[in-house]
């Protein structure tokens, strides 16, 4: 079996694909021959990434979508299949982890938003796309989880709980959609993306020396290797699992 990560003829849908980890994975797939559906709430940002992909010589469909809203998800899936006729790779990357000062100040609205984007949306996307993958030639689904799902902290309780649920969905969908569809998750550690610009970087870098084996945060491109492995033929016997890409987070 060839393990060269050639994705020519494949179609990938990446949520949260307009920046950060999503953009890095989308561009990497395009560079290896895949056509893309790029979606996030900000259509302008999706269009910018689509232009980058088209400059590589691949096709791209930018689509504005709030993945916490099922009616918008259904529109996204229909648009993707209308354009390409299939989806081979689904990457549930969109997420949100808003800050709060104490647990009692987490509102019902905030809690529901976190669960909607990190858990409810991926469930619906996996249901809709996975069913079509089973009816077609199969595929690979990759859920971007978080080390917060494995080592939850008081600063990210709703987020950690939602991502823990995503890990559970990863396992159950692997059985529900197998053997034609593989479903895996990547537990991402602290990556330096647009979101990290709000961090106290001096405090983070100091803390990283004792909490991360590599002593630093990750660059978006450093998640690409794991994503390509899970999406491609190299991961053909890997399903229902969570792979940590976290710099050795304690």
Name each model feature, range by range:
Residues 84, 123, 217-245:
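C-terminal substrate-recognition "lid" of short-chain dehydrogenase/reductases
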Residues 131, 174-179, 236:
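Alpha-helical segment proximal to the catalytic Tyr-Lys
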Residues 126, 162, 170:
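Active-site helix of classical SDR
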Residues 146:
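Residue(s) in the substrate-gating loop at a strand-loop-helix junction
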Residues 101-103, 107-112, 196, 208:
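Substrate-binding pocket helix/loop in short-chain dehydrogenase/reductase
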Residues 2-4, 97-100, 151, 210, ...:
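Short C-terminal tail/terminal secondary-structure segment
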Residues 11, 18-20:
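Conserved glycine-rich cofactor-binding loop
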């Amino acid at each position: 079996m060839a393990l060269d990560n050639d994705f020519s003829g494949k179609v990938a849908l990446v949520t949260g694909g307009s920046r950060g980890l999503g953009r890095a994975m989308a561009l990497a797939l395009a560079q290896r021959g895949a056509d893309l559906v790029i979606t996030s709430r900000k259509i302008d940002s999706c269009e910018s990434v689509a232009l980058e992909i088209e400059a590589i010589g691949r096709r791209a469909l930018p689509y504005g979508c709030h993945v916490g809203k099922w009616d918008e998800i259904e529109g996204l899936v229909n648009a993707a299949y209308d354009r390409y006729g299939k989806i081979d790779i689904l990457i549930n990357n969109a997420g949100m982890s808003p800050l709060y000062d104490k647990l009692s100040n987490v509102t019902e609205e905030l809690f529901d938003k976190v669960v909607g984007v990190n858990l409810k949306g991926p469930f619906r996307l996996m249901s809709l796309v996975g069913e079509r993958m089973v009816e077609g030639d199969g595929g690979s689904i990759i859920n971007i989880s978080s080390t917060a799902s494995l080592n939850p902290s008081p600063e990210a309780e709703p987020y950690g709980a939602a991502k823990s649920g995503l890990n559970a969905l990863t396992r159950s969908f692997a059985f529900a959609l197998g053997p034609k569809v593989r479903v895996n998750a990547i537990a991402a550690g602290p990556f330096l993306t647009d979101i990290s610009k709000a961090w106290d970087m001096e405090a983070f870098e100091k803390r990283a020396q004792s909490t991360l084996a590599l002593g630093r945060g990750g660059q978006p491109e450093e998640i690409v290797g794991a994503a390509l492995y899970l999406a491609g033929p190299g991961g053909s016997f890997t399903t229902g699992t969570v792979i940590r890409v976290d710099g050795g987070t304690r």
